Amino acid sequence: MCMPCFTTRPDMAQQCRACCKGRGKCFGPQCLCGYD
C-alpha cells in the first residue's frame, strides 16, 4: 500500500501510480501497488 486515495482529488489515481512507480491503483480509500 502506498498512501490513502482521496476521491475528491482528480489527480489522485495518477499520484497513486507514480508513488507505486507506475504500477498502482486506487481501491476505495487505499492506493495499492502492483496493479496496472
UniProtKB/Swiss-Prot annotation:
Lineage, opening ranks: Eukaryota, Metazoa, Ecdysozoa, Arthropoda, Chelicerata
Localisation per UniProt entry: Secreted
Chief location bin: secreted
Tissues and organs where the protein is expressed, per its UniProt entry: Expressed by the venom gland.
The UniProt record lists the keyword Magnesium: no
Family indicated by similarity: Belongs to the short scorpion toxin superfamily. Chloride channel inhibitor family.
Entry note about domains: The presence of a 'disulfide through disulfide knot' structurally defines this protein as a knottin.
MF-aspect GO terms: chloride channel regulator activity; toxin activity
Keywords (A to Z) from UniProt: Chloride channel impairing toxin, Disulfide bond, Ion channel impairing toxin, Knottin, Secreted, Toxin, Voltage-gated chloride channel impairing toxin
Pfam families the record matches: Toxin_5 (PF05294)
Protein's job: Toxin with unknown function in healthy organisms. On glioma cells, interacts with chloride channels (probably ClC-3/CLCN3) and MMP2 at the surface of glioma cells. This complex is then internalized via caveolae, thus inhibiting the chloride channels necessary for cell shrinkage and tumor propagation. Has been shown to weakly inhibit TRPV1 channels.
Name of the protein described by the UniProt record: Insectotoxin-I1
One Gene Ontology CC term in the entry: extracellular region
Paired cysteines (S-S): C2-C19, C5-C26, C16-C31, C20-C33
